[in-house]
C-alpha cells in the first residue's frame, strides 16, 4: 500500500487523464493491453477482461476511448477490493462472481464455459 501511495505522490498523475496516468504510473503491459482493447473495440470485437491488472488496463482504455466499454466482457469479480471499484467506474458486471483470486486465467476459462453453456441453451431453446 505504501509503495502505491509513494508512487502516486512522486509522479502526480492527473486523475481523469488516462494518458497522463499511463505515462506516469502505468507499465508497458497496461499500455499494450489497453491498445488491444481499443483495437478490438474499433473492429467491434469483444475482449475478455480477466483480473485486476487487465481491468486497470481496461480502465485506461476506457479513458482514452470510452466506446470500448461496449466490447468488454469481464470474466469474474476478484476478491481484491480495487477490482470492484474499477468495474463500477466502467459500469460492467462480471460473468462469474465467486470470490476468486487465483490468477493464471482461471476466471477467463470459467467465464468462457459459462458463455458457451448460455449459447448452447439459447440455441436449443430457439429451435
Predicted regions: what is each one?
Residues 1-127:
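N-terminal loops that bind phosphate or other acidic moieties
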Amino acid at each position: 500500500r505504501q509503495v502505491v501511495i509513494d508512487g502516486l505522490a512522486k509522479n502526480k498523475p492527473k486523475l481523469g487523464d488516462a494518458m497522463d496516468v499511463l505515462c506516469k504510473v502505468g507499465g508497458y503491459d497496461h499500455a499494450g493491453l489497453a491498445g488491444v482493447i481499443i483495437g478490438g473495440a474499433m473492429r467491434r470485437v469483444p475482449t475478455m477482461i480477466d483480473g485486476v491488472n487487465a481491468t486497470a488496463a481496461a480502465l485506461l482504455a476506457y479513458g482514452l476511448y470510452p466506446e470500448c466499454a461496449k466490447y468488454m466482457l469481464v470474466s469474474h469479480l476478484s476478491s481484491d477490493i480495487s477490482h470492484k471499484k474499477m468495474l463500477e467506474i466502467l459500469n460492467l458486471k462480471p460473468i462469474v462472481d465467486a470470490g476468486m483470486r487465483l490468477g493464471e486465467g482461471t476466471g477467463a476459462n470459467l467465464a468462457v464455459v459459462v458463455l458457451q453453456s448460455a449459447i448452447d441453451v439459447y440455441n436449443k431453446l430457439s429451435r
